[in-house]
Amino acid sequence: PRDLARRLEAGEELHILDVRAPARLAAGVVSPVPAERFHNIPGSELVAMADPADAGLTNDGDVIVVCGRGNDSLRVAAWLTVAGYRAKSLAGGINAWMHMSLPRPLPTPDGFDHLIQFDRPGKGALGYLLVSGGEAMAVDVSMYPEPWLQEAKRVGARITAVADTHVHADYISGGPDLAASLEVPWYLHPADMVYPYDGTPGALPFTPIAAGEEIRLGRGAI
């Protein structure tokens, strides 16, 4: 999935062939892809065609075949290869795409050694890792925190704090579990630990942080 994300970001003209049933697309699709290069044809219908061109596929670029978990797409990609197309299966399918985080370095603020962004194109979400003096804060972590842990290890830092900038409407935060596993604080604004409709307080332990307060991290302050 990371390789595909980088190729799309670079503007490569790829065809995305999603072989799931149309109703499954609501769970997520590979994007951003121009409409004319996104094809949704169930695999059983596609392999019944005499010519893949009947499905609107052209041979002017790689065809990336997508299914739920990367099994059906392997068979379709093999069938397309025999038919003369440059076809590849997306490893892990849309499930892997939705969970993938793509790390990239950003300009580093004063007092910090690294600022790493985690782009999650499947969710349209971003996370971060701030590093200073061997200490790191993981921000807006997904339920799959391995990329944050890997990047911290790569730059020789230890995650000493976890934070969420807000309660996320489109995914479940991995912040509480990561903080608990590392035995470090999980920072959150107190207003985000209250159910907005009836004021019921949340049950997760957290460290409150509000505007005007700061968190010390190595040589820096957030």
Where are these regions (language model features)?
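Short, structured coil segments at secondary-structure junctions
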Residues: 33-37, 83-85, 181-182, 202-204
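Structural motif
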Residues: 15, 62-64, 135-137, 158-161
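Catalytic cysteine-centered active loop of the rhodanese-like fold, especially the PTP/DSP P-loop
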Residues: 41-43, 49-95
